[in-house]
Amino acid sequence: MIKPVPVITIDGPSGSGKGTVAALLAGKLGWNFLDSGALYRLLAFAARNHGVDLTNEEALKVLAEHLDVQFGAARDGHGMVIILEGEDVTEAIRNETVGAGASQVAALPVVRTALLQRQKAFREAPGLVADGRDMGTVVFPDAPLKIFLTASAEERARRRYLQLKARGDDVNLASLLEEIRERDERDTQRAVAPLKPAEDAIQLDSTTLSIEEVLQRILSEVADRDLAG
């Protein structure tokens, strides 16, 4: 019997560090990487570029089915590069406006259905690290290792604040905290695929942990399950 391509899912709320950890883990293992949250950001970004309203479900469905996107390793070996329609949009899709749009389109069942098969197609040998909000519950329910990464809203706002300040953005910590709390409420209360840990997920609170500490804990779980071969 052919063994399925192994998948490690890392789910959690915005700012929990899941994207950074997932990219580093994929690099360490030499596996493929899926930033599913980026797909929703990419859709919101592409919708704006193509003049598609975020409430136009049919137009969003068509756009989602034809998104031309690739994930690749950054040249410095840290993180990932996201290419949309031949253009590097790694930084362009990370602002709060695009993030809010991503959360809005992610709440639409027709959009989630359109992107579901696209996400599953990233499951290729030798393995896949998938980060998002419903990777372990909806997209890859058979994944042999599921992580649910959390952190306090205050810590997540602080991390985002430092990240944006380092980029030269003019940001307000209180506003970021409010936005994160609002997004948490949207993501956990939505009717389709709400943000929640899978029943068999390992829950990690990263509030007081460094990225390296989180990574090492996950690598220990990978070794225990002999997933890396």
Curated annotation (Swiss-Prot):
The keyword Transmembrane helix does not apply. ATP binds at residues 12-20. Transmembrane segments: none annotated. It catalyses: CMP + ATP = CDP + ADP; dCMP + ATP = dCDP + ADP. GO terms for cellular component: cytosol. It is found in: Cytoplasm. Its main location: cytoplasm. PANTHER family: CYTIDYLATE KINASE, CYTIDYLATE KINASE/PANTOATE-BETA-ALANINE LIGASE. This is Cytidylate kinase. It comes from Stutzerimonas stutzeri (strain A1501) (Pseudomonas stutzeri).
